Amino acid sequence: MTKRESNTLAVLGCGMVFLVSLLDLANRLLGALGTAILSGILASMADQTADDSGRLFTNFTACVRRKETGAAVSDKISSHANANKVEILNKENLRGVKQADAVLLACQTHLYKALFDEPGMREALKKKLIISVLAGVTTAQLEAALGNGEDYFVIRAMPNIACFVRDSATVIEKPQRTFPEALLHVTDTVFKAVGNVFYIQPSAYDICTALCGSSPAFLAVFIDSMVDGAVAMGLSHKDAVDMAACTMRGAASLVLESGNPWTIRHQVASPGGSTMQGLLALEQGNVRSTISNALMVAAKEAKKLGSKENA
């Protein structure tokens, strides 16, 4: 990406999609991911000065397929001070790519080939950074769909919906061929603006898609279950949600500090205490194996998303 006074990031896929099935999570959230990343970057710009060297992008283009989606995206980002830096284009992907210095590919998985097939699109994408957050679609698949992979700079990343609050756990796949350091820096900076970044080998990508991309939904189910229990015993729903969410956030901070979830478990569960009785109830319900299995199923499903494209 050339350094100039104005740099533009185009986000291809900003649909506001809601969950229907946990197994469909990785694909169904892609449009929402594009909006989440854009929202998080806009929020991060509020912490930067006008001459901040870390500010890689000054303008943004959000590409959508429906007017109502564009209106929803506009509403979602309206609270940001830099919302006026975002241009929303309806059914104008090519225009968005042409005026961009880098592209975030965040459409639903089954749409990427049709997007590349748009007249002039492959030429417009040449030599530009293409950051893909498509679950299950490998770099090799993307390069093959583009044509000559050597003409494109494609890198995979999997953030999660917490980009909205700049607390995502994002995994970035280490490029397997020579990749410009400047473009790696751009990718790193984009995702550090919305949370934490981890670099992984391609072999671990589908696992991390489930662990980082899907698990916020699993954790939300866990919180919701705790809320149900508290409400059943008389606590108000709002208080229960706030307390359960804050408790999970605090527990996560403790795990990050200690590096071992078992440390927290043993610190809280005293012999003969109420916490130990609650833990035994969880074990009787096979919660540990159920959660582990959910993660493995999600990882397998994420891999299938890419496999279906080659069927």
UniProtKB/Swiss-Prot annotation:
Q: Its domain of life? A: Eukaryota
For this UniProt entry, the molecular function terms from Gene Ontology, in alphabetical order, are: pyrroline-5-carboxylate reductase activity
Record-linked InterPro entries: 6-PGluconate_DH-like_C_sf, NAD(P)-bd_dom_sf, P5C_Rdtase_cat_N, P5CR-like_CS, P5CR_dimer, Pyrroline-COOH_reductase
Enzyme group, top EC level? Answer: oxidoreductase
E.C. numbers: 1.5.1.-
Tell me the GO BP annotations in alphabetical order: antibiotic biosynthetic process; L-proline biosynthetic process
- Swiss-Prot/TrEMBL induction comment: Expression is positively regulated by the KK-1 cluster-specific transcription factor kk1F.
Asked if the Swiss-Prot or TrEMBL record annotates the protein with the keyword NADP, the reply is yes
What does the record give as its pathway? Secondary metabolite biosynthesis
Q: Which residues form the signal peptide?
A: 1-31
Deleted gene: phenotype: Abolishes completely the production of KK-1.
What keywords is this UniProt entry annotated with? Antibiotic biosynthesis, Glycoprotein, NADP, Oxidoreductase, Signal
The protein's matches in SUPFAM superfamilies, at most eight in alphabetical order, are given as:
6-phosphogluconate dehydrogenase C-terminal domain-like, NAD(P)-binding Rossmann-fold domains
In terms of Pfam families, this protein maps to: F420_oxidored, P5CR_dimer
Question: Glycosylation: which residues?
Answer: 59
Q: Which HAMAP family match?
A: P5C_reductase (MF_01925)
Database matches in NCBIfam families: proC
Q: What does the function comment of this entry state?
A: Delta-1-pyrroline-5-carboxylate reductase; part of the gene cluster that mediates the biosynthesis of KK-1, a novel cyclic depsipeptide with 10 residues which is a promising active compound with high activity against many plant pathogens, especially Botrytis cinerea. Within the pathway, kk1I catalyzes the synthesis of the L-pipecolic acid residue of KK-1 from delta-1-pyrroline-5-carboxylate (P5C), a metabolic intermediate of lysine.
Q: Which family does it belong to?
A: Belongs to the pyrroline-5-carboxylate reductase family.
Q: What is this protein called?
A: Delta-1-pyrroline-5-carboxylate reductase kk1I
Q: Which organism is it from?
A: Curvularia clavata
Q: What is the lineage of its organism?
A: Eukaryota, Fungi, Dikarya, Ascomycota, Pezizomycotina
The gene coding this protein = kk1I
